[in-house]
A protein has these predicted regions:
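Long, contiguous binding/interaction regions
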Residues: 1-76
Length: 76
């Protein structure tokens, strides 16, 4: 299964970790991946940094920063 893309703007409201997590939640719910989301949510809430949280979420979807600050294809 191809990972869906989730776009965000790191310099704006949609760059907030919880905002991004909500967008990822919506994608995973549509795919009925409830357990995956629960595990991801717990990991993100325990992440030590913004970058770590992005990397965790990027494991489930393709995160794309439309502001260009974070290139998650190469690592944060």
């Amino acid at each position: 299964m191809k990972k869906p893309e989730v776009h965000f703007h790191s310099r704006h409201e949609s760059g907030n970790t919880l905002y991004i997590l909500g967008m990822v939640r919506d994608v995973l719910r549509k795919q009925r991946r409830y357990t995956d989301f629960n595990n991801l949510r717990d990991a993100v809430l325990n992440a030590g940094s913004y970058e770590e949280a992005l990397q965790l979420m990027n494991g489930y979807v393709i995160l794309i920063d439309d502001d260009g600050l974070y290139d998650l294809r190469k690592g944060v």
